Amino acid sequence: MKNIFLHSLIVENYRNFKNLELKTDNIPITIIGENGSGKTNILEAISLFYPGRGLRSARLADICRESEDHCSVRALLQSKLGLAEFSTQIKRISNRRTTEYNNSKIANNELSKFTSMVWLTPQMEGIFMSGTSDRRKFFDRIVYNFDPKHAELVSKYEHYMQERNKILAEDMWDNNWLKTIEEKMADTSIYIANNRLKTLEFMQQAIDDLENEFPKAELSIDGMVEQKILNGEEDVVGFIAAELHKTRDKDKLLGRTSFGVHKSDFLVKHKHKNILAKFCSTGEQKAILIAIILAEMNYAIKLTKTAPILLLDEVFVHLDDRRRNYLTEFFISINLQLWVTATDLKGIEEFGNKSQLIKL
């Protein structure tokens, strides 16, 4: 098995940190400190070396330290391709972020070729109650760990969609160019939908196989494209292109694309109770989310033979003793780099004793 882990992390002008350097190894790491000390900021900095906008989905302007116009994060990281240096630079004025791998610029969506990460934050605990977009993005991040090319496909699809919206906003359309863009969207959609369905199958199997103290979840994708593929219908690409053509006038008025895989929803049920997670208590929602994260991590290791970095922000808060004890024992037993934040070690003393301790 190949482990993804940080050897070192250096941040400059990042959030509340002027400068911070951490040396780590392939072991559990516990960050303790008062609220506001910057525990989550460290996890966020690490998460920038994975496709997307980090675990907070923050605006670039919010990441730089107040009064500073730039910030940076550097990491020496054991990647899928071996030991490598990664860096990301953010400039507040230009609102731009650049990422480098061994001093060569790479696109953000290429990071999944090198790294693998799973994270859980308190903000994610409301994902079952939030909008479709948040759940879909959450699930697409899971897909990245099973198929590193998925991030690039999603990025490509979003680019084509923006191009289509720009064309529709014009008074006169170039029908040939619009047709070409819609065909590219349709082709890319099939890959995205198939990746989601394959990952959904992997994840459901992982959840069913994993015996733990958390409720079983039943996963599904609510999307027209995914459903047509599941039904075994022919020429789904042609159907997507035809739908995009049909909705041109409507989408021109709306100023956005109203049909496509960017509208699909990720649905989660409490399997035993047979109710959607959004109708469960907040405690049950957190427990279901933890169950999904554990299953993702376990099956990603099983399927890809790669152990991801696991980032867990305040994961032990509001858990009963039974579940907290299960998690501490589970985390001690697994062989991967795990970052956990807590205000103190109360209730997780054993885990704290067996991890690298960082006090802020």
Swiss-Prot record:
GO cellular component: cytoplasm
Alphabetical UniProt keywords: ATP-binding, Cytoplasm, DNA damage, DNA repair, DNA replication, DNA-binding, Nucleotide-binding, SOS response
Binding residues annotated for ATP, in chain numbering: G33, E34, N35, G36, S37, G38, K39, T40
Pfam families: SMC_N
Cell compartments where the protein resides: Cytoplasm
Main location: cytoplasm
Record-level Gene Ontology MF annotations: ATP binding; single-stranded DNA binding
InterPro entries: DNA-binding_RecF, DNA-binding_RecF_CS, P-loop_NTPase, RecF/RecN/SMC_N, RecF_2
Claim: Nucleotide-binding is one of the keywords in the record: yes
KW Acyltransferase (keyword) present: no
An individual GO BP term: SOS response
NCBIfam families in the cross-refs: recf
Function comment: The RecF protein is involved in DNA metabolism; it is required for DNA replication and normal SOS inducibility. RecF binds preferentially to single-stranded, linear DNA. It also seems to bind ATP.
Family assignment from sequence similarity: Belongs to the RecF family.
Name the record gives this protein: DNA replication and repair protein RecF
Gene: recF
